[in-house]
């Protein structure tokens, strides 16, 4: 599935191995799976970010890391990873401001719509929050996440997103990326 998405043109891959059926707790398998995904990303020239695991990102020499609000101090993470890509999940203007001030390269905002990918997801914000964040932070890259599909993607970009993050859409339909590329956004 990852290789097909890479062939179809994804521009960044965030490795997130959590939840039921994940390899979390199986250190050797967890790391090997990450290494395998990293190798594929490198083969296609696509940046590989590790979700929430700074130590693993550094061990693998990944291109970066994405952290949530409960995953550690943003400034400390920036210092630890130096020049690597740092993404931060944010759910309020204050969190976006803090992430930007601490050196985040981009923020992930959402869920924009209801999502089935994350059991503990916040209440969907809709496009209004995305529009407000774009107006308040015109130069900070914003990646929208949560319930985004082919039908919703154009409105998400029109509201100010620089990119979208998808899990379910690709898992349900491996041709999602190729179909997405056909949209005139």
Question: Predicted regions span which residues?
Answer:
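Conserved N-terminal beta1-alpha1 strand-loop-helix module at the mouth
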Residues: 1-66, 71, 79-106, 122-125, ...
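Glycine/threonine-rich flexible loop motifs
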Residues: 117-119
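C-terminal structural segments of small proteins and small subunits
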Residues: 162-163
